[in-house]
Amino acid sequence: MSLSGHTHTKEEVQAEVEAGEVQCPALCHQPVLVQECLTLLEPAIVGISRGADSTRDGAGAFFIDGTLGDGGHTQAFLHAYPALRALGVEIDPSMLARARARLTPFGKRLRYVLGWSDVFFASAYASAPASPATGRTAAGAAGVPGAYPAPQAVLLDLGISFFHYRGAMRGFSFAEEHMLDMRLDPQASQTAADLLNRLPQARLAQLFFEGGEERYARRIAQAVCAQRRQAPFCSARAFAEVVARVVPPMRTARFGKRRGVLGVLPKLHPATKAFQALRIAVNRELERLPRLLTAAFTALAPGGRLAVISFHSREDRIVKVHFRHWAKRCSCPARVPICSCGGVARASLITKKPLVPSCVERAANAASRSATLRVIEKR
């Protein structure tokens, strides 16, 4: 479901952010598809309001931002629904500190959890069913404090904050000289440099192809192995220079031409997809995503909605497959000849096709240009 012409590929449009072309004061991050998220999650939030339907203030509803970042989406929801309670989950301590500062005015309406979202949802909700009387679920292990009500709305924004590219100094961007780290969790054991310096050539090629859909994956892996025999990789710039020597320059991308709004992206850095793939591997993003989707969907209250914003085609395919599976009348495996699940769909697709940002938003916020939004409602 496109809001405008969408002629560029997802893998190409991230480059403007990574190349440092986006200008943003104080390293702020502009959340994407905010109005679309507010609109599509509104029925779940307002529908649960107890005696407050006329004011539509979200009374009695609980919202979880499973990828809090610096709090842009959560801020919008708390502004829109003055009685809404919320919880933000974030793995990066520096980002959580930024979110706390930004969201201080909302006081006790908002709680925070430092940790991976998939771990939080699994430990807080999957260990026990919700009580029909209270809607609450007993909290599990992994240091999750207290008990949380089943959420009416969950939002997952799978993108990386602008702060990570321009302010975190962990090697997410090839525009500046930083240590090649790329960990969202500073306690994680492996950095991006560790992977580049230790993985065999075949595994590196697989990493670049699967995480970045990089057509020159084998060529990059060969160049990396040749370079590390001379000196180990330490900086993001060193890796970017190696990739640039073996990958041809990419073409300029355009968007919105059919609708009369023309946007032009600069020529993309050859290392764009390789950096994306390396970041995904370091943080095990594609490995975590199926667990996160399943646990977040399980946590939802009946009638609750899950919204997921993804930024590259591999992520979006995973989201699409899971959503379609839950919306099927029969969810039995293909090898089972007779339906044993009862033939009742567990959810309804709210977005039959993914929503993408409008031409106006893409022109104003380069980071939004590869975003897609899918929403599902639990029955």
Swiss-Prot record:
A Pfam family recorded for this sequence: Methyltransf_5
InterPro entries: RsmH (IPR002903), SAM-dep_MeTrfase_MraW_recog (IPR023397), SAM-dependent_MTases_sf (IPR029063)
Catalytic activity: cytidine(1402) in 16S rRNA + S-adenosyl-L-methionine = N(4)-methylcytidine(1402) in 16S rRNA + S-adenosyl-L-homocysteine + H(+)
GO process annotations (BP): rRNA base methylation
Positions with a binding annotation for S-adenosyl-L-methionine: G71, G72, H73, E90, F121, D157, H164
One term of GO molecular function: rRNA (cytosine-N4-)-methyltransferase activity
Subcellular localization: Cytoplasm
Family of this protein: Belongs to the methyltransferase superfamily. RsmH family.
Protein name: Ribosomal RNA small subunit methyltransferase H
The organism of origin for this protein: Treponema pallidum subsp. pallidum (strain SS14)
